[in-house]
From Swiss-Prot:
The protein, known as: Large ribosomal subunit protein uL4
Name of the gene this protein is made from: Rpl4
Major location (coarse): cytoplasm
Task performed by this protein: Component of the large ribosomal subunit. The ribosome is a large ribonucleoprotein complex responsible for the synthesis of proteins in the cell.
Modification N-acetylalanine occurs at: 2
Protein's organism: Mus musculus (Mouse)
GO molecular function, one term: structural constituent of ribosome
N6-acetyllysine PTM sites in chain numbering: 14, 106, 259, 333, 353, 364
Modification(s) after translation: Citrullinated by PADI4.
Domain of life, source organism: Eukaryota
Amino acid sequence: MACARPLISVYSEKGESSGKNVTLPAVFKAPIRPDIVNFVHTNLRKNNRQPYAVSELAGHQTSAESWGTGRAVARIPRVRGGGTHRSGQGAFGNMCRGGRMFAPTKTWRRWHRRVNTTQKRYAICSALAASALPALVMSKGHRIEEVPELPLVVEDKVEGYKKTKEAVQLLKKLKAWNDIKKVYASQRMRAGKGKMRNRRRIQRRGPCIIYNEDNGIIKAFRNIPGITLLNVSKLNILKLAPGGHVGRFCIWTESAFRKLDELYGTWRKAASLKSNYNLPMHKMMNTDLSRILKSPEIQRALRAPRKKIHRRVLKKNPLKNLRIMLKLNPYAKTMRRNTILRQARNHKLRVKKLEAAATALATKSEKVVPEKGTADKKPAVGKKGKKVDAKKQKPAGKKVVAKKPAEKKPTTEEKKPAA
């Protein structure tokens, strides 16, 4: 939005356009790098920390000595003496009640972080560029639905305000009071132990007022909740991107807005108020890739497109896939049908033969006359349905074994010799 409109309207204290226009500073077209903003914010935020440490004597203000081995107890130092519960209890160790912590904290920790100056300036440029895009500002939670324009620039007369009621009236005329009402609605008690440490209440962030000279503007705006006041010569990334997230709603005075080109320069001219500083440039000046690829310079270097398309055909087994077989051999369908019909015809013939044989056998068995003595017996039938003669018929059951005739023993009379 800001990049498409090079002129910015200046609004009066009544919330109407004053008729004056300001050229959009080049810093609002700088690349937006959330990664750099977050990195710089994280490191600069660490510089506000206050060193802390536990007492060097904590956990060691008792007399204790290890009992050594052979007592069937741990070798941790134990309090000496007797007559009290404390005697014999473990001491000093971090696993003991009343002992010191593991690796007691020291005040000589590396609390501060150094950040490159150019990197800090890059982060501020990114935060300023993001503050001119309504989508990013609204995604941060600012209520700017009725704000006439972004970036929002007002006349320098605002820098001379000394009363809060004048500041409130200005915000209402600029339709920015909805953002303050959001702050009022968000005021609540902090969760956690910060309540005990003089950080009881928390609230959302409101607009950031950026001015050039303080002629009373600080006193006018400082009592409105959520408002942050910044001098354009001392912009702070911690205020322009709270939490390391770009998209703060900023209200500029005219003189502060015009001073941005001198502070950060343009791509044609270096910054006059900073030594050896040039505005960061985009890695791609034109992000329309389709336009770049279709440009004659690129097309001239490319080879001609290959019109012929080679598609890989999935090979299927025609013996298993009928559709593929019919593609290769259309007569296969007729052959398969003829085979099925032939099999059905053969099956019918086989069934008829079996029925005829069974009928013939039944008629034969009815014509046979039974012999004498064999009226009660059923005719013996062979394997193929033929009758067996009585002579050839084998007796059923166990085989009869022929026994030898028993020899007679000679009597006593026979034993006597003849006289």
